[in-house]
């Protein structure tokens, strides 16, 4: 199972996971209890229960580069363009906007 830490600005907001049945996103309890907590997307409102989807959530898929940037990522990191979680974890550490995703290494789990 591959996972990534999701940050808003530099604040840890939650975890996105790839599971055998699809994808899960869950806000961290610490983030949910912050006074100024905001959802990462209107499609992923603040809630304690995890979100589940068979495909990568549209919001996260939208963070992945397109066009020539996707071609460069595919060539440089040898990632198949259909491996959306692999692209998200590799390419979205420093995105345009205030949301970023950092991979969780095996040892961190």
Residue ranges: model-predicted function:
Residues 1-109:
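Phosphate/dinucleotide-binding and metal-coordinating scaffold of catalytic cores
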């Amino acid at each position: 199972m591959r996972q990534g830490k999701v940050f808003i600005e530099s604040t840890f907001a939650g975890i996105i996971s790839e599971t055998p049945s699809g994808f899960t996103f869950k806000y961290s309890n610490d983030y949910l209890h912050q006074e100024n907590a905001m959802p990462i997307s209107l499609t992923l409102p603040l809630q304690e229960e995890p979100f589940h989807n068979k495909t990568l959530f549209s919001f996260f898929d939208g963070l992945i580069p397109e066009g020539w940037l996707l071609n460069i990522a595919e060539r440089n990191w040898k990632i198949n363009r259909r491996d959306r979680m692999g692209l998200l974890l590799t390419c979205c550490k420093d995105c345009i906007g205030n949301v970023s995703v950092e991979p969780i290494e095996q040892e961190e789990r």
